[in-house]
A protein has these predicted regions:
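Active-site region of glycoside hydrolase catalytic domains
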Residues: 162-278, 291-312, 340-343
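Bacterial N-terminal signal peptides that target proteins for export
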Residues: 1-10
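An active-site-proximal structural segment forming one wall of the substrate-binding cleft
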Residues: 79-99, 117-144, 153-186, 209-221
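N-terminal carbohydrate-binding accessory modules
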Residues: 24-99
Length: 399
């Protein structure tokens, strides 16, 4: 079939789909990934919270120790976070964020019996936070976080793929009737890691990464309901921009067009630890990374979800006589660039760091001003809809 015919059919299919309401909000089945990315604005992570765990190498199913009385709150707070309150989430929405990323270690409270059965109490606690964030009008992104790394390092590929399918099936079924503001992100930073004691060639590694993402998409779609058209985020190779923009990384095939994003993390650690933040090389590196993503994904109709990017730059890590001086100025620089490239920037944050979960506000007034300005600019930016549905639908497929 010619590309033009496929694209015409795909566009007609999308336009004919009705919007469907559900008990917890609206499911717009005609919502495309690019439109969703625009609506997601600026985001923040609920970091060191539901992805927190105490490792247990002897537990081959959960990979985690039992903490305290084995309640969800024991794990939610084990890395220093406070219990997530309604007021905390209200403050996130009021600060101008449009997206809350909730990383989750699903092995917490899981029995070591090889069934990979998620704890009903644990997923119910995650659901409480998701419900509150959705009620506040936020997009919510949940994933498999750190648990993917445990599985990959301790089990052979086929067992990992089966376990991932089992875990994602449970998550997807729990949230199958949720609205389109709930987005699933497959994994965190572990794709590309081999099992301990083994080695993979470059081609084998990319194949493993691609199989993991395909298993995620296939599993979620098979649960039906609103998941049949939900926006999904495929995770990059280590979420590394250089590795993920390589042609060997393939976006998963999907049963519906234009419902996929790709996830990477903006990591400028080398400049941070070499005390080069704010200099010309740091600025050029940031631009070069954005250009790689634009050429590989955005220009091909695939939105880029930057699931973690730096929120605070300490003064001691700046270059002498920086061109971009001060943490808030660097934040402005990175968020402005993300907005210009139409990426979804999500700040990495932990308890009482950038955003205070006890005071329920952004800790710095100058940082708050940056978030307000960038969020407003994204919201007011004219968006014309699907830029390249045809290329996206045919991306990495034989025609």
């Amino acid at each position: 079939m010619k590309i033009r015919q496929i694209c015409a059919a795909a566009m007609a299919f999308v336009l004919l789909l009705p919007s469907v309401g559900c008990g917890k909000g609206q499911m717009r089945k005609d919502l495309d990934a690019m439109t969703a990315a625009h609506e997601m604005g600026v985001g923040i992570n609920l970091g060191n919270t539901f992805e927190a765990f105490w490792a247990d190498e002897n537990d081959h199913t959960a990979g985690a120790s039992t903490i305290g009385e084995n309640t969800p709150q024991n794990y939610e707070t084990c890395w220093g976070a406070v219990v997530t309150t309604d007021e905390c989430i209200d403050g996130i929405a009021a600060a101008g964020f449009s997206t809350l990323r909730v990383p989750v270690y699903w092995g917490n409270m899981m029995a070591d019996d090889g069934t990979y059965q998620i704890s009903a109490d644990y997923i119910a606690r995650v659901q409480e936070v998701v419900d509150k964030a959705l009620a506040d009008g936020l997009y919510v992104v949940i994933n498999i976080h750190h648990y993917d790394e445990f599985l990959i390092k301790h089990h052979p590929q086929d067992e990992v793929l089966a376990a991932v399918g089992t875990v994602w099936k449970q998550i997807a079924e729990q949230f199958r009737n949720y609205p389109d503001h709930l987005v699933f992100e497959g994994f965190n930073e572990a794709l590309g890691t081999p099992q301990d004691g083994t080695e993979l060639t470059e081609d084998e590694t990319y194949d493993y990464v691609n199989r993991m993402n395909q298993t995620f998409v296939d599993t979620v779609r098979a649960t039906g309901g609103n998941n049949a058209a939900r926006i999904l985020i495929a995770s990059g190779y280590w979420t590394n921009i250089d590795l993920t923009t390589d042609e060997k990384f393939c976006m998963p095939e999907d049963t519906v067009p234009d419902k996929l994003m790709v996830s990477v993390h903006y990591i400028d650690n080398s400049f941070y630890w070499m005390n080069q933040i704010g200099g010309e090389r740091w600025e050029q590196y940031s631009t070069d990374q954005c250009n790689l993503l634009k050429a590989r994904f955005t220009d091909n109709g695939i939105p880029v979800f930057v699931g973690e990017c730096t929120s605070i730059y300490e003064d001691s890590h700046f270059i002498q006589n920086p061109r971009t001086e001060g943490s808030s100025a660097c934040l402005q620089y990175i968020l402005d660039m993300a907005a210009d490239y139409t990426f979804v920037p999500v700040l990495w944050d932990v308890n009482d760091n950038f955003y205070s979960r006890t005071d329920c506000r952004i800790s710095s007034d100058s940082d708050q001003a940056v978030i307000t300005e960038v969020a407003d600019r994204i919201a007011q930016k004219e968006y014309t809809g699907l830029p390249s549905l045809c290329i996206l639908y045919c991306f990495n497929r034989e025609i």
